[in-house]
Amino acid sequence: MKLHERLRELRSERGLRLKDVAEVAQISVPYLSDLERGRTNPSLETLQTLAGAYNITVHDLLEGVEFYGASTEGALPKGLSDLIADPTLGPQITPDWVRTLSRIELRGKRPRDKQDWYEIYLHLKRILS
């Protein structure tokens, strides 16, 4: 499934109009329409906003979406997607941090859970800020 199809599917499943979603996501109706028609691609920030409008995680929004013929199935590690979805901790994690954290791996191992991801985020933020 392509991203624009997934976006339209999410809206249709919920019985929402373009106007409803655009208002909650604070984007224009024409822009949302272009996204759903595949005429333009959203930024990570827009994906986070749309995921919030649908009350799902970005991971869930992208689940099964294909990019360049490859599926995003399991694109973000579960613990990281749990951290992003956390209503208290998630808003602290900017799109840049999501990209940075999603690349962390050493000898095939990644942090195990939400708490591990959060500790790594805090340490890196302290060191790099």
Curated annotation (Swiss-Prot):
Keywords: DNA-binding, Repressor, Stress response, Transcription, Transcription regulation
Keyword Methyltransferase tagged: no
Superkingdom of the organism of origin: Bacteria
UniProt site positions, description: Cleavage: 106-107
GO cellular component terms, semicolon-separated: cytosol
Job description of the protein: Repressor specific for genes preceded by a radiation/desiccation response motif (RDRM) site, which is present upstream of several radiation-induced genes.
Protein name in the entry: HTH-type transcriptional regulator DdrOC
Taxon lineage: Bacteria, Thermotogati, Deinococcota, Deinococci, Deinococcales
Gene: ddrOC
